[in-house]
Amino acid sequence: MLSRKIVLAVAATFAAMTAMAQCGKITGKIIDNGTREAVIHATVQLLGGDSAFVAGTVTDVNGEFAIEAGGNGKFIVKVSSIGYSVITKTVSVTGGMDVALGTLTMMPDAVMLEGVTATGQAKKVVLKEDTFVYNANAFRTPEGSVVEELVKRLPGAEISDDGKITINGKEVKRIKVDGKEFMTGDTETALKNLPTSIINNIKSYDEKSDMAKMTGIDDGNEETVLDFGIKPGMNKGTMANTDLAVGNHSRYAERLMGGFFNDKVRTMVFGNFNNTNDRGFPGGGGGWRPGNARNGLNTKKMVGVNFNYEEKDRLEIDGHARWNHTNNDTRAEQSAEYFNGGRSSFANSLNQSYSRRDRWVLRMRMEWTPDSMTTLLFRPELSTTTIDKRATGLSASYNSDPFLLYQSPLAPHAIEQMAEEGSIVSTSASNSIFYDNQKYAGATLLASRKLNGEGRNITIEAEASYNKGANEGMSLADTHLYGIINTEGNDSTYQTNRYSTTPTKSYRYSVQATYSEPVFRKTYLQVGYKFAYGHDKSDRSTFDFSKTGGDTFSGLAPAYRGWGQYLARLGNPIGTYLDNDLSRSSDYRSYIHEMQMTFRMVRGKYQMSAGVMLQPQRTRYRQVFKGISVDTVRTVTNFSPTFDLRYNFSKVSRLRISYRGTAAQPAMADLLDITDDSDPMNIRRGNPGLKPAFTHSMRLFYNNYIPRHQRAVMTFAHYSNTRNAVAQTVAYDEKSGARTSRPENVNGNWNANAGVMFNTAIDSTGYFNVNTFTMLGHNNHVGYVAKGRDAASVKNTTRTTNVTERLGLSFRNSWIEVELDGSLNYTHARNLLQEQNNLDTWQFGYGASTTVHMPWGMSVSTDLHEQSRRGYNDRAMNTNELIWNAQISQGFLKNKALTVMLQFHDILHRQSSFTRTLNSMMRSDMRYNSINSYAMLHVTYRLNAFGGGGGRGQFHGNGGRGGHGFGRPGGFGGRRRF
């Protein structure tokens, strides 16, 4: 009897699931009422009878769409696109039958199109809800340039020396092309290889994690995305772009790019080889960016392929494979001041390093939708990385500022003189060799099932990863202590000669389940549970040759993986030099349970969510170091509340306020009461009394767009405060120059920043445009300092205020663009313990740029900017640098497919490479070697065979003659997921 009931229950469940899977599909096509052309990437939403969101999609290149109803009943189809009036259509789905709406026409919105219709001038930026849409045609870039040059010109965008992209105060973590994944995890490849000539627009928005998109639960893992939209007509067919360049000072740059596109498949292949530090094109505007240093001489090589496949509403496959190689030659001069209680200590160093890096990466994403209620997502990844490095260095520490006496404090005569005066503490000469090899494999599997059309769903996610590494290193140092006398009455000297090997292993896995239940109308309760396990193992063996004699390794120069030449000079087998006190093995395991609950409301004007996460955590740490074996277990519970409110004033105006509290536990190694003096000049101690830290973080974001005046406004603010933050107490030994650090909990660490972006046309015709980006930041950094290893610690607070401003005024018509621009970065730092260390530094620049297009296909771009620094300790760094760049290009053949360009970088030989860092413990100024002044001759050839006419004759740099807005209305590129 019981078995019969079970069979009936299973049959009923199967029947219900089958019925749910029989969902009607609604199809249609959207066209422009005037041109009768397809409206591409229009937003199509399916709403229930109560206007609740059911499903969404965007139209394809033919203006067509298909959307699953998810059940029977009456629905509203809502179609919207920037530049058009919204259209709605009521439909009924019965018996799971498909519904064909046929062709729907969209009428242009007279208000939104007023600026473009009247003048034909391109709007620079349009805002729609949470998305910034930048018109690529409104930002002229030099012929043959890549999208990095385009991003530099976007209002509110910055690209740092290390390639980090920041836009509107947020770091860009992902690049997409037409809404599809592109080289995930590698923003540099897109910036350095995608040509601007194929880009129609750039979207900037925050994208939730895969888990959050499927469940609706905000897990705090949003990523800021730059989404490059391809020009209409260029998304079907084949294209190729070749750029070959040579220059003086042995500079070269070769870039190859090919693409194949059709309705289902998109394949792009890239190759890039250069020794110009991947430096962009000169001229064409954009102004100066503070801190635009060139850190060393870099040779970079890259080969990659990106693949996208889409079977509409059924299957998506995204993947990429790439090889990156980097050779680096860096000469770094550092000048540092350390805040030690009542007075400062100073240090200077000169280091020459060479490194090479090879990295292979394979990443894929597969999303399968067997029916409208079920989604499966799989993300595998494989990578291998090898790094080689060799370096030599010279450093010295002082008890007074050496620049007050000598322009070159590391010069032999300066060191000798300061030794007689007693102002120098120590010197050290070193060389080192390092090798590291890492292999990684990981995968994520995510499955989501809608249980009805009202918002009830369940999602399961599983992750696993494995990493195996091995590194070897050889380091030699010869240290001279001027304040310590040996038994013979001379200055104390000692050598530190060591070789180490460190194999490592780590693996992790986690399982997570979330469930969403509609509790009221458009109101949902979501709960989730996650278990995560992690295991990290390291076993460092250190061999000490410090007592073998000062001449054992004389005459040897560091070479990649060249420790064999050093080990060959040892008089005994290497095993006899093993130092158990310097060797260390560790085993770290973590067991984390995570429970979360989120309450979410969705209304016509706003969305609100509030939640809480509890995280019981058990960790076990085992270590053998200095002959001491430690086995410790820690059990803690972390707590994290969240709140998020999004209010839509209109389609182009939104306010967002969010809060998140996060708890963080001290590192287990910091909790061990062990002194690590393996580096005698930098000694570390543990602190078993450390408490967990808790950070409050609040954000505000507002944007608005006024189409009539082509005016965009954006403002943001962020505040963060950490209780029981971990800071390092640093004790300075005036005799030896050694520093002993110990972690301590501090309160008072907080930071805040706010920014405003404003972009508007000045005249009614849109020829004149002004844009400004202003940012104000303040950081309150607390630390402890002490003079002497056993001296009492003194609390030190450094308060730093930064003001950044970028202002540009431009004029543009069909053949010329002129821009006047200025930039300012002011730092106001106050040290409460030592007022003499208060700093006020300025970096500012101003100048002009212009681009002219001649009727016969010639283009000339140039810019002239004065860059200045003030307030730096080293007087040699308070400079004025007049930077002049220029480029001239001429197009040949049909549609200017062949272009010859001559570029001149830093014609006046005035640019330098300099950076500064500042916190409560120290300030540090760095200067690097670089080749900033050179000329390059480029030959570029473009071949394209596109299926649509839109791509032909338009394969030129952005903003070429006749650039018009965003193409036809509605052509805003990338696909957005719902």
Give the role of each language-model region.
Residues 29-39:
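Structural motif
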Residues 39-40, 66-74:
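Short Pro-Gly-centered beta-turn/loop motif in secreted/extracellular proteins
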Residues 49-64:
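Short, acidic Ser/Thr/Gly-rich low-complexity loop/linker segments typical of extracellular
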Residues 127, 164-212, 225-232, 265:
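Periplasmic plug
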Residues 31, 45-47, 78-84, 94, ...:
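Short, acidic, small-residue-rich periplasmic hinge/interaction motif at the N-terminus
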Residues 30, 131-154, 166-167, 177-182, ...:
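Short, polar/charged loop or turn motifs at beta-strand boundaries
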Residues 185-187, 208-250, 264-978:
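Primarily recognizes Gram-negative and organellar outer-membrane beta-barrels
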Residues 15-25, 31:
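Beta-strand-rich domain onsets/edges
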